[in-house]
């Protein structure tokens, strides 16, 4: 495969499906791929418009209209309790429409320690799912939601006694979690770890049953049977990132302004490893930092640790081959328009790193796409980067992985699971070939929905385009994508269901007359001072556009009749005609 390797030493804008970074892979022997443009939704090369603006839109949904302040987690919990106590209507039933073939933003994946065929996955707003066949088919874990657990899943781990832990909450979204939940029977029943609330990360080792938690109250640990969590004395503030070695010896975490701390004695003591790169330390004051620890020890009998620092783009990457004692920066800042553009203005939204299990000197980094770094020089450590996935090719291409990667997990046979805004992707050959694994994994985030008179449904989704289901595909819940990017509000004509209206960022509005097979854009009449629709970041065009298809005249309606006058009338005369059906006048 002739891929280019980069060697490095010590609401609404035009849709995002374009071919950035495609050139280096077009030279490969994988075949020739067309860019996944979906016609009118092609853009100028940017993958997405919107992690920050999508979050801003979501936060606006959680503002109290009376106070103007964001609704607190405590208030949301109170509201949920009130709703749960309301009497249910006995006359209303719901049927799930799907999609069962398209996923959504996935922050957490966990492979069962006792059975690698069983895999759990969690969406940031879709709840918990389980697969019993390595991700081929997923089923919702209803018992998790029925227990009162929060559907906003941030992280998962499983201790050696088989207890599964699911963390809820986020440091970015407007919603918080309602604690860390655990199951001792593979998801059949659930309980809450005492006194937990918003938790962004949980990890565990292969040597004991402690679960370590990154929380707003610092680093905590707990095991089944403990009356309360134990606070781990690192420093004050929020624990923002956390990883642990399989043998439990090494714990690396970040606090506050992402200051790095390392423990080499299983969490008994921590050392501050923040400082300048020139002093072989990890700089702090990064908006986001992610860590990874090697599964095995390196040739010097130490663990290899990695740190990836980002703002909107890459700030730096660092490696330590001596259990975190000293660190070497092996790449510095990079971002658009550079070809080496891992995060593409979204470094605080999508960032993840993992060490290849059998090679402490090789990592995979997830941003918009997935990249590999392999160390080729020992002193100082340096090597080359290689892009191993592309979001912009057709989904059946062997190099396709959906954009915006958030999670990476390996099973004991080195089968690799990636969680992203499109759901779950899998590789069994270290990233040389990929396939999507979303059947039944319905965690898609919808901005708006529409339906027609025959029962077909359509919806605009976060980073999964505009989707349409007229129940004619292989399953009742299978959708097809009729538009790209972030789909927003949409409409289907009642009079002619072949007519559809869809929207994407910044007032881009489109019409289809053939059920979404082809589209044409149209623009409303605007003042001359307005930017053209689709203008990136325009103050005149909001990220999210709301539309309403006004179909007031229905020639088939029975609520009006034609009347033939039998005499002359003057303008303004009142005419009363008794209704033959009820005696009421019309």
Where are these regions (language model features)?
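N-terminal Sec-pathway targeting helices
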Residues: 1-11
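Beta-propeller blade termini and top-face loops
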Residues: 25-586
